[in-house]
């Protein structure tokens, strides 16, 4: 693409594999190539009934020592009996789950929830996982400043000639 000016909203995880001519400054290229990203995954679990709303349930928000880590109900104001529990996990747990197939991720989610809520298995319908680090458009999740990278954010945001960086 050729243009007089450009607003670029591409994560560094993708940008480092795009040929740019003329090249960005050495400082910008270093930051693009070395930007650190975390690992994050969501697993949405659909159930025929919202058993977590029952009076004797342990609740709608559960923090665990399992690979699912944090589980929240995600069916607020949704009509009907069905409901969604959503797990947020990151770091090593997300990396380990990220190496598994979608079916295996769902199986782990189902089994984990059945240990937390006795009735979970009988209402289970399906699970779907999103691991941002395997997404072809991001190849990463959240970025953060690693050791020695305190200036990266400023450098990555700085315009390079007619190219402006967003996101």
Describe the function of each predicted region.
Residues 2-28, 41-44:
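Flavin (primarily FAD) binding-site architecture
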Residues 9, 18, 39, 53-167:
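Conserved flavin/dinucleotide-binding core of flavoenzymes
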